[in-house]
């Protein structure tokens, strides 16, 4: 154990003219020393984007918090979410940050811009492993956390 703590904050802003936000963040405590944070981004904006991003973040955060394997979580999402017929992309993308004991973080990223990590006041290019799960390109990273990351 260490003296680090995780500070989690976010702000969702609706697209101009929309009543709902197409992004959704879900934070779930998983046991005493584990937190799962999921950012899901629904394609476009409005009701459809909001529903799909909420569905995505809720399914993933619940499954990850219950300790299910990454492959099963992604397979479930891939089977659940529709694919845009004109663009051929999923209607929702996601980034997962799984913080364990405030010591390490597992980053799992699908089709979102990569997480930007600032370490020692500079951009830190952390290692990423590319995985293919059910035809989806997933990036996974495991990081040892440091003060002020």
Regions found by a protein language model. Give the residues of each.
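Conserved beta-strand-loop-short alpha-helix elements that form
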Residues: 33-45, 109, 142-149
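Catalytic core of PPM/PP2C metal-dependent serine/threonine phosphatase domains
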Residues: 21, 52-121, 132, 138-140
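Acidic loop->beta-strand submotif enriched in PP2C/PPM serine/threonine phosphatases
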Residues: 18-31, 125-149
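Regulatory cytosolic signal-relay segments
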Residues: 1-19
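Short acidic, Gly/Ser-rich segments with clustered Asp/Glu that frequently serve as metal-coordination loops
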Residues: 16-17, 42-50
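Membrane-embedded alpha-helical signal segments
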Residues: 29-35, 48, 56
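Beta-strand-turn-beta hairpins that frame and shape the catalytic cleft
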Residues: 3-6, 31-34, 101-105, 145-148
């Amino acid at each position: 154990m260490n003296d680090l703590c995780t500070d989690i904050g976010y702000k969702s802003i609706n697209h101009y003219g929309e009543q709902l936000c197409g992004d959704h963040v879900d934070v779930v405590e998983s046991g005493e020393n584990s937190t799962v944070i999921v950012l899901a981004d629904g394609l476009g904006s409005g009701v459809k984007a909001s529903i799909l991003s909420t569905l995505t973040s809720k399914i993933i955060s619940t499954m990850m918090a219950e300790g299910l394997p990454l492959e099963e979580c992604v397979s479930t999402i891939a089977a659940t979410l529709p694919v845009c017929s004109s663009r051929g992309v999923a209607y929702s993308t996601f980034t997962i940050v799984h913080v364990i004991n405030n010591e390490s973080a597992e980053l799992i990223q699908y089709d979102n811009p990569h997480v930007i990590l600032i370490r020692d006041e500079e951009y830190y290019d952390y290692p990423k492993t590319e995985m293919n799960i059910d035809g989806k390109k997933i990036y996974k990273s495991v990081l040892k956390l440091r003060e002020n990351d």
